[in-house]
Swiss-Prot record:
Disulfide bonds: none annotated. Its EC number is 3.2.1.23. It catalyses: Hydrolysis of terminal non-reducing beta-D-galactose residues in beta-D-galactosides. One of its GO terms (molecular function) is beta-galactosidase activity. GO terms for biological process: symbiotic process benefiting host; xyloglucan catabolic process. Gut bacteria supply the human body with energy from dietary polysaccharides through glycosidases that are absent in the human genome. Xyloglucans are a ubiquitous family of highly branched plant cell wall polysaccharides present in the vegetables we consume. Enzymes involved in xyloglucan degradation mediate the conversion of otherwise indigestible plant polysaccharides to short-chain fatty acids. Its main location: membrane. Optimum pH is 6.0-7.0. Residues 1-19 form the signal peptide. This is Beta-galactosidase BoGH2A. It comes from the Bacteria. Belongs to the glycosyl hydrolase 2 family. It is found in: Cell inner membrane.
Amino acid sequence: MMIGKLKYLMLGGCLILGSCLALGGCLMLLGACSSSSLVSPRERSDFNADWRFHLGDGLQAAQPGFADNDWRVLDLPHDWAIEGDFSQENPSGTGGGALPGGVGWYRKTFSVDKADAGKIFRIEFDGVYMNSEVFINGVSLGVRPYGYISFSYDLTPYLKWDEPNVLAVRVDNAEQPNSRWYSGCGIYRNVWLSKTGPIHVGGWGTYVTTSSVDEKQAVLNLATTLVNESDTNENVTVCSSLQDAEGREVAETRSSGEAEAGKEVVFTQQLTVKQPQLWDIDTPYLYTLVTKVMRNEECMDRYTTPVGIRTFSLDARKGFTLNGRQTKINGVCMHHDLGCLGAAVNTRAIERHLQILKEMGCNGIRCSHNPPAPELLDLCDRMGFIVMDEAFDMWRKKKTAHDYARYFNEWHERDLNDFILRDRNHPSVFMWSIGNEVLEQWSDAKADTLSLEEANLILNFGHSSEMLAKEGEESVNSLLTKKLVSFVKGLDPTRPVTAGCNEPNSGNHLFRSGVLDVIGYNYHNKDIPNVPANFPDKPFIITESNSALMTRGYYRMPSDRMFIWPKRWDKSFADSTFACSSYENCHVPWGNTHEESLKLVRDNDFISGQYVWTGFDYIGEPTPYGWPARSSYFGIVDLAGFPKDVYYLYQSEWTDKQVLHLFPHWNWTPGQEIDMWCYYNQADEVELFVNGKSQGVKRKDLDNLHVAWRVKFEPGTVKVIARESGKVVAEKEICTAGKPAEIRLTPDRSILTADGKDLCFVTVEVLDEKGNLCPDADNLVNFTVQGNGFIAGVDNGNPVSMERFKDEKRKAFYGKCLVVIQNDGKPGKAKLTATSEGLRQAVLKISAEEL
């Protein structure tokens, strides 16, 4: 390995089982090595339907005979907190979204056929927040405190054949605050019931790496873990077949050996792929590895794994390289909530997030600050995102009163093990993060006695030199860092390990350990140019940048005045507007503007890229404000999924598509001085016109990624024209809007899948008589749905709104709001009607079709 360069040859894909969406991927059933007509005994069923739920505790609900007839019937995934009211009294605080917590119980009754006696049944949870305990027929199967980890239990010894079985789950999210952002409450990710024969591939039981790759061939290393849960030793053959995207076999191998009773055995194999198609950002090509376990002519198991082949390296001088091409990671950080849907996982909602980001030019996701839903990584595999996969937000030292720190010593190895095994086959995952802004960076940093808001802020200000590691010192915190990195490398030596650090000094205990492969800074732009000198031969990435603050649709002038909010971390901050300007002139004291980071990354080859804080607004952490603010201002896109103006800055810098974005709106007081900004690309110059009169030609330069004019408002039109070599290539016009007159409904899709889960996100706009958006409209819009659909949620992107997310009405916020329609599980049409007092109503029809 070259000094200062980390080179990696990767990699496999996410784990696929049975016939539905599996842990991290799509489910398929494919043959391998021999007759594809042989049926695998493996089945994996969606176990989300028809649960009963009760919010409250003190029950004997674990017992199978408990009467739950009056409990609510619902389908998972489910987040009970998002259904509640915002309140200053909720112990989650504004940092946790000011939504309720509590204890909840879930119960499901099911039966298993006696013909399946001898099969192995497991219940698999993708994530339960938090402190879950699972019971089958009154028997406790175990507890899992960490709310972001996937886990499973063996049901087999406790099942009753041809009789009712009762699965009960207690979820305890009563002790709060336990998170610095909105966590959600309940079984908020998918649940699966798997059935296998006694000899089968273990959970997350394949591991695919690439030992070499060039244009002619790639050599894949396979490790398959088999479990023999029978009473006898068995001679088996593991057949591994790699298939291309069209289902054609491109490589095959087989190995035979003995699987001892009651034990696991690992089969190692190698495949050679001729003329491999590489996984890349723009062409995320996926193969499928089909693993078949045979005993003579009997198929004991069939298991599939999507595989992506690619190479990447991180270099201390040249940054990030993917498949031999120097590439900047243009990434964003993302928390896990889905706006008005809360934490409850929905594949289409996650896909929408990623589509909006991809259109912006984003190519990277940082999973902040916890293991993500498997569906997110599966989508990143298929859509071409570079993922920084993160394990923890805290280690032993807590950031909030009741967070994971109290479980860390007992549970971190188990959780880290399950996290790495689950995610290590995803081609999108290129780096592990073992922590974010952990207090172990310093010798003695405690947040025990601070409020949640103060704890968030103290993390991002400097600490005295006495709290840093001394030269040659091997502190407890450095030793813990070494332990965690060693643990990760033992499970996956193919990827680098980093941590998001907000102490840039080389005396940072994590840095002093010497084991982090990549130096990662959260913020501290002024220190970044010194990284090559302070950390020679270490690759570098900005793990978190900016923390710029914006409210969609709100503008504070003059735009060249910078607002640094909050003014002090130890004092409460308030501004009567509870808003932040969209001019790129407001950020936190430890952060910076979007333009500053874009230029820094552009001008320094050693910077591998950045993950902007954040791609979307999220519930909770409403910095710089406290109550009644309850969601963030950090996003490039607001909570409802509406891009803020800065979205088009990134689009102009990160893509080659034509961009011409003029803002703000053109509804002001006559004679008022207005700052008009423009983001553009693919042009030499832009010229602004007010009612046909030129306001001058402007050109960007290396120091300014936007242009601006200060003009006096007069009703009419403001227009910008972009020219390339003197030729007009684009133009944008904004008209002064009149009084609100009508509603416009715009769906993101007109045809849904009739699966009971698919969603249509409908943008609701208030227009004047001429069809212009009314930029200050706040009309209350009422919704009704008839036919095959229902309202899954409503939003408008307002961080201060006290309106419920689960409702049939929403006020417009700067002219817009959102209604989300969910299919009811049947094919047909749903008719959405939107009404508002004094406005013409709008009607939209949405179709749903069977797969």
